[in-house]
Amino acid sequence: MTNIPVYLYPQEYAAENGELDKYRLSRKLNLACKEAIEQAIGAHYSENRLDTSAAVKQVADAFGYERTLYVLAITVQHKGHDGRISDANKDWAMSVPIFEDRIDGSADNNRFLVVDKVNPGLVDLFVRGTRRAQAQEKEQQAERAKSKTAEKPSILEKLKRPVQRNSPNNSANFLEPEL
């Protein structure tokens, strides 16, 4: 499920552009992700403490960070009035482009993606934990990519090296004739 991209556009756009299948699949996964977030928070909340890293890992492993953060951005945007959501998370959520998903003036269909079966304070912790985990994963990926490129010389470096001619004078197996 993590390899299926989030479809960002509203249903009306998808219908006009022949992409309803992509829209429907993405929406189905978004709803499942929302439910998984609610379930993970409930499962990892005990004795007034949320095991944020375990809850985030459970959802991110199943749906990926892109979809998880998309659903969380919708949630925070819809709960912008709630004081239990931090200003930092509200600012982040407002920076994520979310299209309204209305058909013929109806209410925004994104309201069905709002994580609302758990306390907003716990949602705030989950959002912060997810953003942090994604940043750490990006750092690790960058370090792995950097170490891979450090191990292998670039093709440009290979091309800059002087050419070694393959001649008898340079050959290790060349024996000078005895005189």
Please place each PLM-identified region on the residue numbering.
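Gram-negative host-targeted secretion-system effectors, predominantly Type III and Type IV
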Residues: 1-178
